[in-house]
């Protein structure tokens, strides 16, 4: 699959995870609704589904990885930043095929696209502290 399709999968995953985090609906329902309402012709659907289900199943673990380095309580973290960080940490922890730098750079780009003005700096700072303990740089 092309890198652009993977990027679109991550973009869609941020949006769907944002919805899931706010609604607390079943992740399968969120996925179904998202796919029925969005134009996903240029999206790696398999990867989108894996990110969505993988982050949902491992949300507690992913949150526990980031919580110690946050400058605020996890509950105070913005929903966009939380979704972006969960995706990046999932890729670093569970997807050895995704290069270290790709996971971090993609998270920064997602934060620039969807987050508040300086959220990409926050995301970069958190990942800079957490990522080396999850996986060695390559």
Curated annotation (Swiss-Prot):
It comes from the Bacteria. One of its GO terms (cellular component) is cytosol. Signal peptide: none annotated. InterPro entries: NusB-like_sf (IPR035926), NusB_fam (IPR011605), NusB_RsmB_TIM44 (IPR006027). HAMAP family: NusB (MF_00073). It comes from Serratia proteamaculans (strain 568). Belongs to the NusB family. The keyword RNA-binding applies. One of its GO terms (biological process) is DNA-templated transcription termination. The keyword Chloroplast does not apply. GO terms for molecular function: RNA binding. SUPFAM superfamilies: NusB-like. The lineage of its organism: Bacteria, Pseudomonadati, Pseudomonadota, Gammaproteobacteria, Enterobacterales. NCBIfam families: nusB (TIGR01951). Keywords: RNA-binding, Transcription, Transcription antitermination, Transcription regulation. This is Transcription antitermination protein NusB.
């Amino acid at each position: 699959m092309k890198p652009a399709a993977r990027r679109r999968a991550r973009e869609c995953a941020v949006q769907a995870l944002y919805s899931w985090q706010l609604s607390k609906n079943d992740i399968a329902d969120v996925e179904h609704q998202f796919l029925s309402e969005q134009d996903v012709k240029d999206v790696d659907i398999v990867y989108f589904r894996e990110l969505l289900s993988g982050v949902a199943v491992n949300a507690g673990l992913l949150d526990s990885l980031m919580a110690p380095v946050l400058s605020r309580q996890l509950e105070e973290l913005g929903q966009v930043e939380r979704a972006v960080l969960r995706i990046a940490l999932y890729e670093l922890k569970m997807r050895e095929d995704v290069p270290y730098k790709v996971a971090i750079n993609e998270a920064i780009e997602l934060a620039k696209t969807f987050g508040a003005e300086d959220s990409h700096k926050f995301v970069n700072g958190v990942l800079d502290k957490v990522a080396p303990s999850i996986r060695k740089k390559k």
